[in-house]
């Protein structure tokens, strides 16, 4: 048997996050700047969490109002607190609620930055609107942890697999920008960290310029999750007995078989 832990044996997110955050120190100690902790919440994947978002210190990336139809499915940036201080109760309650579900539901990432909220929000808004080939238009949905993993790359010990990064190193550095560390949970429920210090290249300018090959890689990489989303939405009984990691690999396997029959459209793939 492999020595790697199974998906079920991974430590709870509350435990791993507490250990990791307690180890984080500001990068510019001489300047005395604390690291600010932020939550980037993908409300569309777990709408119940929006009710726990505090009234202050939270902004929708698309600037929608909280009670609007769009605001209820928009990604939200929430300031939780800073290093060296305990979180206030509303922020801690929100973080706990996220940590309780994030290993099974990829709905949030955590960010640490010396920037205050307005500066970080401005950076994320610039980064999410890349230049596309042939004047196409689309947002870079890095608030979805699975998209973030595709953009920056991710290794998974449990499946012994690796997602190669869609972005070039200079583009990855540009996406991180003022973000010192960016955390998400992998498909097998493990905490994964991206650190700005890991990218030595000079950052590319924003907005990012994506090539046709990069766009195609993002689209193809997102197909399994898109199909799972529609299955969960319309026919949840089909996946009741499969945990998220197993469901993802099942979908990827079936896509290989479906494409052998020449099936490519979303409806055809779902029916298959």
Regions found by a protein language model. Name each.
Residues 90-98:
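Short, charged beta->alpha transition segments
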């Amino acid at each position: 048997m492999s020595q790697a832990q199974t998906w079920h044996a991974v430590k709870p997110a509350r435990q791993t996050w507490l250990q990791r955050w307690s180890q984080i120190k500001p990068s510019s100690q001489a300047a005395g700047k604390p690291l600010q902790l932020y939550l980037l919440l993908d409300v569309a994947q777990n709408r119940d969490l929006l009710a726990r978002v505090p009234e202050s210190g939270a902004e929708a990336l698309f600037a929608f109002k909280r009670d609007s139809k769009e605001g209820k499915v928009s990604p939200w940036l929430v300031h939780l607190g800073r290093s060296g201080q305990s979180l206030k109760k509303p922020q801690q309650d929100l973080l706990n609620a996220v940590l309780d579900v994030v290993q099974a539901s990829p709905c949030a990432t955590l960010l640490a930055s010396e920037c205050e909220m307005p500066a970080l929000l401005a950076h994320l808004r610039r980064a999410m609107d890349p230049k596309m080939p042939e004047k196409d238009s689309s947002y870079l949905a890095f608030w979805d942890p699975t998209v973030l993993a595709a953009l920056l790359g991710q290794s998974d010990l449990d499946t012994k697999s690796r997602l190669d990064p869609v972005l070039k190193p200079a583009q990855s550095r540009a996406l991180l920008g003022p973000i010192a560390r960016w955390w998400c949970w992998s498909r097998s429920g493990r905490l994964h960290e991206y650190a700005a210090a890991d990218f030595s290249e000079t950052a590319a300018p924003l907005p990012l310029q994506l090539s046709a090959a990069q766009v195609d890689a993002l689209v193809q990489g997102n197909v399994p999750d898109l199909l799972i989303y529609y299955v969960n939405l319309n026919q949840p009984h089909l996946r009741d007995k499969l945990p998220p990691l197993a469901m993802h690999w099942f979908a990827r396997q079936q896509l290989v078989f479906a494409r052998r029959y020449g099936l490519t459209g979303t409806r055809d793939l779902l029916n298959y």
